[in-house]
Each structure stands twice: as structure tokens, then as C-alpha cells.
Amino acid sequence: MSGFTNKDGRQNLAPCFNFRSSPFRLTVGERELKLEEDKNQLSKGLDPWTSNPTASASTLHYLLQEKERAQQAHEQLQIYQQQQGFGSFLQHRIRQPASRGPGGGGGGGDGGGSSGESTPVDALATAFGAGRIVRSAAGRKDRHSKVCTARGLRDRRVRLAAHTAIRFYDVQDRLGYDRPSKAVDWLMRNAKAAIDELPDRAEAPPPPAAASTEQPEGTEQANSTSYGFGNTTGGTMTSAASAAAGSFLPHSLGADRVSDSVKSLFPSSSTASGAASAGHDEYRGSPPDLLSRTTSNQQPQELCLTLQSNQHQIFSHVSSNHHGMISSAGVPGWPDHSQRMQAWHAPENSTGDGRGGGNGDGYMFAMPSRQGLDQSQLFSHGEPLQSSGRGWASARAWLDPLAVAAIHHQPSTMAAGQVGFGHLVGGAGGGGGFMGFLAPAAQRLEGEEEHGSEVIR
């Protein structure tokens, strides 16, 4: 290192480097590498010209904070502009009803409430022709924009039904327009006369309440006539009685198979002229000529209670072994001749077990009442019970007292008996009949070994 002499002859004491022997002498490639390293250090927040990394890090942190402040200020400015734009839109909406008058303002308020669309807070109202387009400030696509109408904000895009869209595009193709909006403008121009005749925002009349309530009643009446016993003069059955009748009466049975021997199935009563309210009272209070009226018509009606009769005298005697505890003596309103009701679908060559060929169906009969049990107690379990013949164990718990009374009573003590009608059930092959009165053939009383008939429960 040596000094050098200026033009005026004075010596410059500034240091002078010998670049030939200096280690700082770098080639072009080395200089480029050095610049790249400097850039990398600057990007990492390190100052290559200083040896204090703490100072360079604090400087970079300050720059980042300033950048964040600038971003926050920009966002606040955007929010302020959005609020100003939306405020002008609200002021415009407030001035519109005032210019229309009190009548128009009231209609506009009702229309805005009935639109069902909430006004977005971040929306911007942009003037577009004669109307306004409300765009979202979040930068979403144009399909989310809305227009200001007399009844509030509405979507610009309109969904059409499939057949309507097909017809509309056919009209557009025939007109030769490339955009659907042009076809809509053409349709509105041609329908201007009809549009002008329309009232302003006519409200649709509310649907009549009477028409909506009459339809279910008609349906219930149709169900009651198809599921009931065909009582056309005594009034229609209620919905509960209709459901109870439809729960066990088959549809496939016709009225042509009804025998004359079962016309006197129900006890005669001069006061029972109308249908009962619900449950077992429906069947117990039926008029005496219920079946005769339905079968004597010129056009046979569908009678779901179809019973086939054979010539076995089921109810004409009482068995000596107490298996046929059946009696109709002393029952008021019943005729003196024997009453019988054969099993459903009983074959002609039915066996002598009293079950109609073992099809799981039983008979309806009169059973004497136990002392201390009145008619209401006998029918305390009048709910419709469904059984397939294998579920007798669940019903025997409350039938045991009646079974004991039926077995140990003599036929002479059955003068003041009550008529008990159970619910008709059908079995798949293992016992059945009227719930609460007949037991399956497999379940016998203790000490009895006889076969060929059912034990009456």
C-alpha cells in the first residue's frame, strides 16, 4: 500500500491497494456468485455490510410490520368504500317508497318482506341502465349478483322447468337470437298489451280451507265403505272402526259365498239402528238385519265378512265332555233355532275336529258370564289383537279365569249368559279362531286325553 501524487504536487495520503496482489481481485464468475450470495443474505434478513445480525433482523422486522400496517389500512379503506356504496343504495331504496306515495310504499314493504331473501351487508350497488345490479364485494362470479326490484333483491338467473326451457330455446332458435336475453326481450315486447292489463303486484288468493279439509273426509268414507260390513242405512263407520274392521277382514272374499245360515249372526235389538262408535261396540251393537240388507240388494256389494257354511250342527248341542260349552239359551234377542258360524274357507269334506279342516279358524259362540263379572269386564280387552296361532301363550294370562268358569259351569247354570264376541284371527295351521274363546288343539286341560275337538277357553 502506497500513496500517490496529485497534479499540484502534493502527496495523497489515502491508502492505495495493489489489486494485482490483493485477494479481492475476483473474476467475473466469482463476482456473480458474490452477488447471488448477497441477495440470499438480504432475503434472509442479514446485512452483508455489517457484522451485527441483530440490527439487521430488527430492521427486517420493522419492514414487515410496516407492510402489515399498509395492508390493514388498505382493507379498512375497502370496507369504508363498501359501506359508503351500500349506504347510498339504502338511501335510494328509502327514497323510492316516498316518491310512490303511502299506498305504493305499503305494497313495496309487503313485497320486500315476502321475497324471503336477506340483503347482503357486503354488497355493492352498481348503476346499470334503468336498474341496479348488486354485486358481492368478495369477488364472486357474476351468477351470484342480484338486481333491485320492487319486491326486493332478486337473482339475475332464472331457473325454468324442463318443458318450459325446451319451448323457450325452440323460440330462441326460431328467432335466430344468440342470447336468451334477446328472446326474452322479444317475448316481453310482444306481450306488452297483456302485461299492461295486469294489476300491480297482485297477491295470490289464499287456498280455501274447506277444500283441503273435505278431501280427507271423502277418503275416510271410501275406506269405511270398502272395509266395513256394508251398512248403507245406519251411517258410515268411524275411522277407528274402519281400521279395526280392515285389520282382520280379507278383501278376496266375495258376497256370493255368504250363506243364509249366518244372517242371524248378531243379536236382534230394536234400538241398535246405527253403527257403533269404535272397537267391539261396533260389532256388538249391529242391527239384526245387517247381513240381510247387504245381501238382498240387486247389485251384490263387497262383503268382507264372508263365511262358508256346512251342515254340521255346531251350536245345536252341548258336548258331554265339556268341550263344547256352547249355549244360546236365555240370551235375549237370539232366535230359538241354533246359531252357527262356520270357519272361513272350510272345505266340504271337513274333519270332525270342529275346526273346518284344520285351517286354523274357529267359531263364534255365546259364553256364560262368571259371577261377579259384568258385561263391561268381559269386554275389557276389546282391543284388536292379532295372532298367528303360535302366540296363544301371551293371551292365556288373562283368559285363565274365564276358562275355569267355562269348564266348571254346568249347562243348567248358563241361563243368564252374556254374548261375547271376540276378534277374528286366522292361523297358519296351529290353532286359531276368536281371540279369547278358543284354544289351539295342542293345548289341552290337565287330565283330559280326548282328541278331535278344541278346548273352549
UniProtKB/Swiss-Prot annotation:
Biased segments, Polar residues type: 212-230
Annotated stretches, region: Disordered: 95-121, 199-231, 263-299
Statement: the UniProt record of this protein carries the keyword Ligase: no
One Pfam family this sequence matches: TCP
Feature: compositional bias, Low complexity: 268-278
GO molecular function term, any single one: sequence-specific DNA binding
Main location: nucleus
Coiled-coil region list: 58-84
Residue ranges annotated for the TCP domain, each copy included: 140-198
UniProt biased composition (Gly residues): 101-115
InterPro entries listed in its UniProt record: TF_TCP_subgr, Transcription_factor_TCP
Entry's Gene Ontology cellular component terms: nucleus
Localization in the cell: Nucleus
Record bears the keyword Electron transport: no
UniProt keyword annotations, A-Z: Activator, Coiled coil, Developmental protein, DNA-binding, Nucleus, Transcription, Transcription regulation
PANTHER family: TRANSCRIPTION FACTOR PCF7, TRANSCRIPTION FACTOR TCP4-RELATED
Its job: Transcription activator. Binds the promoter core sequence 5'-GGNCC-3'.
Assembly with partners or alone: Forms homodimers and heterodimers.
Protein name as catalogued: Transcription factor PCF7
Gene: PCF7
